[in-house]
Regions:
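Low-complexity, charge- and small-residue-enriched intrinsically disordered regions
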Residues: 123, 249-259
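N-terminal, motif-rich segments that launch catalysis or mediate targeting to/interaction with membranes
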Residues: 1-47, 51-54, 58-248
C-alpha cells in the first residue's frame, strides 16, 4: 500500500482519524454509529467502500496516475467498466461472487485487495516496470500473454501480445479499440472480489459498531447514575440545613470570590 508519488494511500484516508477535517475514517464512523449519529456513520461507510473498490483497480495499486489529462490519460479498466457495466449487465457477477471476505480489521481488507490487484494485474503504464516484479507472464500464444491468478492458480489472459515481425520484439498492451477481452478478463476476477470485500466490511462495521455502541451506552448510563447520585447527595445536604445556614453558606462563597 503506497500512495501516488508517495502521498497518502487510500488506506490512510480510510483508517487514519484526523487526516481531513471532514473525517469519515473508520474510527470516526464507528464513533458516529455508537453515539446514534447513523446518517453520518452510513455516509462515512459509503466513503470507505468506495476506497476499498479503488483497491481493485490496477492503476490505484501500481502508482499509475490517471486523471484523464494528456499526460496521464485515463484508466482503460475504469473507462471500460464505466461504458460497459451497469445493473443489467452485472447479473452474472452476482452468481459468481461467493461468500464475504472476513478479516479482523479494516486495514486487512485494504492490504489484501491492494496486494492481490498489484500482483496479478497490469495497468497501462506499468507493463514494463522496474518497480514491480509481478504479475509474471507464464505463457504466450499468437495473440495473448497469460498469467496465473494467485487466488485459484488459474491461467488467464493478462495482456495482448504481438511479436514485431521486423524487430522480433514482443509488443504488449492492455486494451485495443475493438477487442476488450483483457478488460473483461480482469473484471471477471476483480469485481467479485470487490463485492466480497465490501460485504465483509459492512459486516465488520456492524460488529464493531455494536460493541462501540454498547460501550458508549454503558458509559452514558454510568455517568447519569453518578450525576444523579451527586445531585441527590447535594439535595440531602441542603435539606438538613435551615434557611439561615443556607444564607451563611452562600455568603461564604460570595465572600471567598471577592477576597
Amino acid at each position: 500500500n503506497i500512495g501516488i508519488n508517495n502521498n497518502r494511500t487510500a488506506k490512510d484516508w480510510g483508517t487514519d482519524a484526523g487526516v481531513v477535517a471532514n473525517d469519515f475514517s473508520w474510527p470516526k464512523i464507528i464513533e458516529y454509529y455508537a453515539q446514534g449519529e447513523e446518517e453520518k456513520a452510513f455516509v462515512g461507510l459509503g466513503h470507505i467502500l468506495h476506497l476499498s473498490e479503488d483497491m481493485t483497480v490496477p492503476e490505484h495499486t501500481r502508482n499509475d496516475p490517471h486523471i484523464g489529462d494528456p499526460i496521464t490519460g485515463n484508466s482503460p479498466y475504469e473507462k471500460w467498466v464505466g461504458e460497459n457495466k451497469n445493473r443489467n449487465t452485472l447479473k452474472d457477477v452476482y452468481y459468481s461472487v461467493g461468500s464475504p471476505l472476513n478479516f479482523n480489521n479494516i486495514s486487512e481488507y485494504f492490504d489484501f485487495l491492494a496486494k492481490y490487484t498489484n500482483s496479478n494485474f497490469f495497468s497501462k503504464d506499468s507493463i514494463e516496470s522496474s518497480v514491480y516484479t509481478k504479475p509474471v507472464i507464464v505463457d504466450y500464444d499468437d495473440y495473448y500473454a497469460y498469467g496465473i491468478d494467485a487466488l485459484n492458480n488459474e491461467k488467464f489472459k493478462i495482456l495482448f501480445a504481438k511479436r514485431d515481425k521486423k524487430t522480433g520484439v514482443m509488443e504488449k498492451f492492455i486494451d485495443t479499440k475493438d477487442d476488450h477481452i483483457i478488460m473483461s478478463s480482469y473484471f471477471s476476477r476483480l469485481s467479485p472480489l470487490a463485492i466480497r470485500a465490501e460485504a465483509g466490511i459492512i459486516d465488520l462495521f456492524f460488529k464493531e459498531g455494536k460493541i462501540a455502541r454498547d460501550k458508549y451506552l454503558a458509559e452514558q448510563k454510568a455517568l447519569q447514575e453518578k450525576t444523579a447520585q451527586k445531585n441527590q447527595s447535594l439535595a440531602d445536604s441542603l435539606s438538613k440545613k435551615g434557611r439561615f445556614s443556607l444564607f451563611l453558606s452562600g455568603l461564604g462563597f460570595l465572600t471567598n470570590d471577592y477576597i
